[in-house]
Amino acid sequence: MIVTVTMNPAIDKTIDVETFVHGGLNRVKHIIMDAGGKGINVSKTIKALGGDSIATGFLGGNNGNAIANMLAIDEVNAEFVTVDGETRINTKIAEADGTLTELNEAGPEISEEELSKLEDQLMQYAKEGTWFVLSGSVSSGVPKTIYGDIIRKVHEKGAKVFLDADGELFTQSLAAKPDVIKPNREELEKYIGADHSLTEEELLHIGNELLEQGIGTVIISLGHEGALFLTKEQSLKCPAISVEVHSTVGAGDALVAAFTYGMDKGEDFEVCARLGIATSAGAVSTEGTKPPTRDKVDELIQLVKPIKL
């Protein structure tokens, strides 16, 4: 069973323009509205791959109702805690050349009572055989230690956790030893306070240090270059697949979804890595944050050629 947790979901509003003119008039070509937030994107992608998950987190107000309706249409199992505040809207301005400008709202204030309800709900799912995906930002009122707290509690019940967060949410959670993490190059540069762009050799060194700290699997996203997949037993580099890019929004979430889906099904590590890269490539070839079809992923996975490191 896979449970995704989206602490700060959003309606993703993607606006297509030819070229965005700062301070000038922009004519809109097309608008797409999707249920968004990193965990929600993961759940939608798992569904597209043929799997099931339970999407949890916080929803509130008219925007929250709209997201719930969108998830119902997509046949995604949703069990969110209802909050008093209004779920946010994240606006993404997509230009014809692939440039993306994002305007993300802060999200509602979460009360201690609402947070406690969610934690109680998560513990109902916590058991051996359950994968939790903790991803994305948190709203005001939620402590930066929340992911680490959840990891420790569900680990006691035998569950596993894929953590996809950055900044303080990432650093505060490492001591809890999540089973899988997925930082990108920029996040690791921030994590160690680097004053230069890290080389692949340096990234591998940091990844191995994280493994020594007790992390089970470290996936380092390299953007258009692919990703590194590291465990103590094996290390792979999966170069990215060349596809026509429509939107990079949700590409990382697609990788998280596919890798977790594969692990939940008991697939081999290399198979999970290949599935992650193929699904991520499929995601960037779709509009907005819509996941790729399973047929598209099956087509792309044939092109993924892992390199053993």
Describe the predicted segments one by one.
Residues 46, 184, 252:
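Short, conserved phosphate/pyrophosphate- and ester-handling motifs at nucleotide-, phospho-/glycolipid
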Residues 24, 48-129, 299-309:
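Conserved N-terminal subdomain of the carbohydrate kinase-like
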Residues 131-201:
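Conserved beta-alpha-beta core of the PfkB/ribokinase-like small-molecule kinase fold
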Residues 1-56, 64-66:
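Glycine-rich phosphate/adenosyl-contacting loop at the front of the ribokinase-like
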Residues 18-27, 184, 189, 236-240:
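Short glycine/proline- and charge-enriched loop/turn segments
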Residues 153, 171, 200-309:
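Conserved phosphate-binding/catalytic region of the ribokinase-like
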Residues 14, 103, 173, 191-192, ...:
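Residues that scaffold the ATP/ADP-binding catalytic core of kinase and kinase-like folds
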